[in-house]
Curated annotation (Swiss-Prot):
It comes from Neisseria perflava. This is Ornithine carbamoyltransferase. Changing E121K: In strain: CCUG 17915L. Pathway: Amino-acid biosynthesis; L-arginine biosynthesis; L-arginine from L-ornithine and carbamoyl phosphate: step 1/3. Its main location: cytoplasm. It is an enzyme of class 2 (transferase). Carbamoyl phosphate binds at Q15, R39, H66, P67, T68, Q69, H204, C205, L206, P207, T232. One of its GO terms (cellular component) is cytoplasm. One of its GO terms (molecular function) is ornithine carbamoyltransferase activity. It is found in: Cytoplasm. The record marks E79 as: Important for structural integrity. The gene is argF. Reversibly catalyzes the transfer of the carbamoyl group from carbamoyl phosphate (CP) to the N(epsilon) atom of ornithine (ORN) to produce L-citrulline.
Length: 232
């Protein structure tokens, strides 16, 4: 939209990490482009790209973090709240170990927000991520809560976030395990009402498994009897 030239390299169009090292790929692309956005898997890949590219490298998504989504989510919460962000509370419920849970925790800490994570303890962010969030919160005044009680997590919040229960690249076999662990963390009308806030908003980075109108959604319904998974 702004007139810049862009090139998309899909996985099959690049030999990065396969026949060509990440370091060499970074050096070549850095000579050809003014900036690079990477969307893939390991955080260590984008960090190596950034080390050797010589141009700005943006994180479009890794297993661990999703900062570009955070820009959109922070803007959305600011636009749809009558309060400044440092007076706003939000909750993330579901599997909090991956990029969305990690990133929302750090985002809220950096912006001085009231951040709630509602998830089984085994699906909380890593100890390192939690420690980093608490360290930032000491500087910004953010409030951080991690709880296994979904209703406690959403009480009084303005926004309820969630994400898919099975992430990119994970096998179908993990669905049953996640459903067993997370069935009490589905975002339902009842959970929204538990916020006690009639103006509470729901947020999801998408795509969401919220009905049977996709192949995966229909397979989940036929296999597990769920019409919608993380939200319904």
């Amino acid at each position: 939209d702004q007139g810049a030239g862009a090139t998309y390299l899909e996985p099959s169009a690049s030999q990065i990490g396969h026949k060509e090292s990440i370091k060499d790929t970074a050096r070549v692309l850095g000579r050809m482009y003014d900036a690079i956005e990477y969307r893939g898997f390991g955080q260590e890949i984008i960090e190596e790209l950034a080390k050797y590219a010589g141009v700005p490298v943006f994180n479009g998504l890794t297993n661990e973090f999703h900062p570009t989504q955070m820009l959109a989510d922070a803007l959305t919460m600011r636009e749809h709240s009558s309060k400044p962000l440092n007076q706003t509370a939000f909750a993330y419920v579901g599997d909090a170990r991956y990029n969305m849970g990690n990133s929302l925790l750090i985002l809220g800490a950096k912006l001085g927000m009231d951040v709630r994570i509602g998830a089984p303890e085994s699906l909380w962010p890593s100890e390192g991520i939690i420690a980093a969030a608490h360290a930032v919160a000491k500087e910004t005044g953010a409030k951080i809560t991690l709880t296994e009680n979904a209703h406690e997590a959403v009480n009084g919040v303005g926004f309820i976030h969630t994400d898919v229960w099975v992430s990119m690249g994970e096998p179908k076999e993990v669905w049953q395990e996640r459903i067993d662990l997370l069935k009490d963390y589905r975002v339902t009308p009842e959970l929204m009402a538990a916020s006690g806030n009639p103006q509470v908003k729901f947020m999801h980075c998408l795509p969401a498994f919220h009905n049977r109108e996709t192949k995966v959604g229909e397979w989940i319904y036929e296999t597990f009897g769920l019409n919608g998974v993380e939200v319904t």
